[in-house]
C-alpha cells in the first residue's frame, strides 16, 4: 500500500475522489490484517472512527473543511481521549477510560481528523524498544524479529506499515526520534512548550513534548500546524504567534551552515550508520550547504544526567497512581498502606518500578544535593554548549541512534545498554531544543537508518526545510517494507 502524503489525501477528499469514511475503512482493514503481527495498536474502535469520518465528510460537503479534514490519524496511548481507553501501556491504567480530551486530541478533532485508534507504547513512556508495554511488544515492520524503538514504537510501526498516514507521539529522551529512525519514518520533537502537555500522561514534566510522526517532513509540517498553539491549561505552554510550518519547505539550502558535533561521531557509532550519515551530509552539500565542526562537550554526560532527572520527576508524577481514585487496585489488602504497596507492586512493570526507585533515591535526604542538584547544573551546561554551537551553525546534524533496530529481547536484561540507544537524542530534551529524525538509508540487514537534525529554539520551520529538501533528492522516506506492501 503506497503512502500518499497528507496533502494528497486531503486533495482526494476535497475532490470527492474518496470519502473520509472510505479512507478510514481502508486503514481499518489494513489494521485488522496487520495488527495481529505488528501489535502497533492497543485500542481500535471502528464504530467511533467511522462516526468521526462521517462528521468529517459532512464538513467537506458543507464547504467547511480545513487543510486536513477527513484525513485519519493514530494517537499514542498516552493522550487522554474522551470515551476511549487510555492505558499508557500499563496494567495500572488497563481499564481507564479518559473523561476528557488532551489538547493534542482536541486540536486533531477540531481539524476534522478521525482517530484510527490508540497506539502501543512502552509503559508510561519508559523504554527504548516498546518491550515494556503491558499489552505486549511491538514488532518492527521491516523485520518482525526486531524492535521498533520506543517509547512511541506503536506510532512509528503503524506509520511504517501504512496502517495510518500519520500519528502523534511524545518525546522525553528520544521517544519520537529513535523509533522513527528504527522504523524508517520521519518524526519531530518540537521546542519544549510549543505543544501543550494538557491531558498527556506525565513521565518527566520538564522534558515531555508531543510531536508528529509521518512518512515525510512535509507531512510532519502539516501536522505540526494542527497541534501547536498556546494552551492556558498547560503552565509551560508558550504564547507565540501561530506559524505555518510549511512556509519555508521549498527554500533553497544555499548558505546553510550544518554543525557536525565530534561527540556524535565518536566510538560506539555503528559503521553502517556513520556511512549513511556521511552520505546524507554529502547530499546536503550538493544542495548548497556547508559543514562546520562543532563540539558539544557536555553531551557525553547527557545519559547520567537524564537518568537522575527523569526518574526524579517520574517518582513524583507516578505517585498519583495509588489505587484510590482511578486505575488498578490490588484485589486483596490488609489496610490502606498495604493497598498502596500491593497496588503499585502489581500495577507497575519492572522498568517503571526501577525508575521510580532511582528517582526516589536521588530525591532523598542526603542525596538530593549530590545527585539531583548536580544534574540540574550539568543540564544548564549542556544547554550552554548548544547555544555556543548555534553561533556558528544553523542546524546540527548527526545520527539519531548509535545503531539500527536490535532483536527482540536482546537488551532486555541490560538496562544500561538499552539506555545508550538515546545517547544522541537526550541532549536536545535536556536543552528543550527541537529535534527530528528522518530516514537516510538501510544497513546490510535491510533495517532503516535515521539521521537527526537539532535546531535552535523555535527553528522547526528551518529544520523542516532542510529535511524536505533532502527528501526531494532521496527516496528513503518513500520506501516501505516489501513484506507488507
From Swiss-Prot:
Allows the formation of correctly charged Gln-tRNA(Gln) through the transamidation of misacylated Glu-tRNA(Gln) in organisms which lack glutaminyl-tRNA synthetase. The reaction takes place in the presence of glutamine and ATP through an activated gamma-phospho-Glu-tRNA(Gln). PROSITE patterns: AMIDASES. Keywords: ATP-binding, Ligase, Nucleotide-binding, Protein biosynthesis. NCBIfam families: gatA (TIGR00132). It comes from Thiobacillus denitrificans (strain ATCC 25259 / T1). Heterotrimer of A, B and C subunits. GO terms for biological process: translation. One of its GO terms (cellular component) is glutamyl-tRNA(Gln) amidotransferase complex. HAMAP family: GatA. Belongs to the amidase family. GatA subfamily. This is Glutamyl-tRNA(Gln) amidotransferase subunit A. One of its GO terms (molecular function) is glutaminyl-tRNA synthase (glutamine-hydrolyzing) activity. InterPro entries: Amidase (IPR000120), Amidase_CS (IPR020556), Amidase_dom (IPR023631), AS_sf (IPR036928), GatA (IPR004412). Its EC number is 6.3.5.7. The active site is at 76 (charge relay system), 151 (charge relay system), 175 (acyl-ester intermediate). It is an enzyme of class 6 (ligase). It catalyses: L-glutamyl-tRNA(Gln) + L-glutamine + ATP + H2O = L-glutaminyl-tRNA(Gln) + L-glutamate + ADP + phosphate + H(+).
Amino acid at each position: 500500500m503506497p503512502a500518499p502524503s497528507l496533502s494528497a489525501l486531503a486533495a482526494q477528499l476535497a475532490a470527492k475522489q474518496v470519502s473520509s469514511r472510505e479512507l478510514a475503512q481502508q486503514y481499518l482493514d489494513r489494521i485488522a490484517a496487520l495488527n495481529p503481527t505488528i501489535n502497533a495498536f492497543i485500542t481500535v474502535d471502528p464504530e467511533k472512527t467511522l462516526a468521526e469520518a462521517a462528521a468529517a465528510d459532512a464538513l467537506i460537503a458543507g464547504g467547511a473543511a480545513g487543510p486536513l479534514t477527513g484525513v485519519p490519524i493514530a494517537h499514542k496511548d498516552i493522550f487522554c481521549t474522551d470515551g476511549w481507553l487510555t492505558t499508557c501501556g500499563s496494567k495500572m491504567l488497563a481499564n481507564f477510560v479518559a473523561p476528557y480530551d488532551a489538547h493534542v486530541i482536541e486540536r486533531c478533532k477540531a481539524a476534522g481528523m478521525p482517530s484510527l485508534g490508540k497506539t502501543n507504547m512502552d509503559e508510561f513512556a519508559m523504554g527504548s524498544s516498546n518491550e515494556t508495554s503491558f499489552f505486549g511488544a511491538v514488532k518492527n515492520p521491516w523485520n518482525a524479529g526486531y524492535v521498533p524503538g520506543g517509547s512511541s514504537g506503536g506510532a512509528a510501526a503503524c506509520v511504517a506499515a501504512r496502517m495510518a498516514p500519520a500519528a502523534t507521539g511524545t518525546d522525553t529522551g528520544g521517544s519520537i526520534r529513535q523509533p522513527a529512525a528504527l522504523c524508517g519514518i520521519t518524526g519531530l520533537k518540537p521546542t519544549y512548550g510549543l505543544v501543550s502537555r494538557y491531558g498527556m500522561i506525565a513521565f518527566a514534566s520538564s522534558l515531555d513534548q508531543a510531536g508528529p510522526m509521518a512518512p515525510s517532513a512535509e507531512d510532519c509540517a502539516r501536522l505540526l500546524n494542527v497541534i501547536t498553539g498556546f494552551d492556558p491549561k498547560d503552565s509551560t505552554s508558550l504564547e507565540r504567534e501561530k506559524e505555518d510550518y510549511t512556509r519555508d519547505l521549498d527554500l533553497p539550502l544555499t548558505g546553510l551552515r550544518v554543525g557536525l558535533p565530534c561527540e556524535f561521531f565518536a566510538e560506539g557509532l555503528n559503521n553502517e550508520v556513520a556511512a549513511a550519515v556521511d552520505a546524507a551530509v554529502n547530499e546536503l552539500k550538493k544542495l548548497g550547504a556547508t559543514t562546520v565542526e562543532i563540539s558539544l562537550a557536555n553531551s557525553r554526560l547527557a545519559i547520567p544526567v537524564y537518568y537522575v532527572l527523569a526518574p526524579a520527576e517520574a517518582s513524583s508524577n507516578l505517585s498519583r497512581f495509588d489505587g484510590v481514585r482511578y486505575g488498578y487496585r490490588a484485589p486483596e489488602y490488609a489496610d490502606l498502606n498495604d493497598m498502596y504497596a500491593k497496588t503499585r507492586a502489581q500495577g507497575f512493570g519492572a522498568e517503571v518500578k526501577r525508575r521510580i526507585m532511582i528517582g526516589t533515591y536521588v530525591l532523598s535526604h542526603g542525596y538530593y544535593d549530590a545527585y539531583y542538584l548536580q544534574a540540574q547544573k550539568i543540564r544548564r551546561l549542556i544547554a550552554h554548549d548548544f547555544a555556543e554551537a548555534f553561533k556558528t551553525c544553523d542546524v546540527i546534524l548527526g545520527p539519531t541512534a548509535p545503531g539500527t533496530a536490535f532483536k527482540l529481547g536482546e537488551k532486555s536484561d541490560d538496562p544500561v545498554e538499552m539506555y545508550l540507544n538515546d545517547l544522541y537524542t537526550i541532549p536536545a530534551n535536556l536543552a528543550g531544543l527541537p529535534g527530528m529524525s528522518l530516514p537516510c538509508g538501510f544497513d546490510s540487514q535491510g533495517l532503516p537508518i535515521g539521521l537527526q537534525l537539532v535546531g535552535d529554539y523555535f527553528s522547526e520551520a528551518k529544520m523542516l526545510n532542510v529535511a524536505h529538501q533532502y527528501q526531494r533528492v532521496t527516496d528513503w522516506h518513500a520506501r516501505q517494507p516489501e513484506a507488507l506492501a
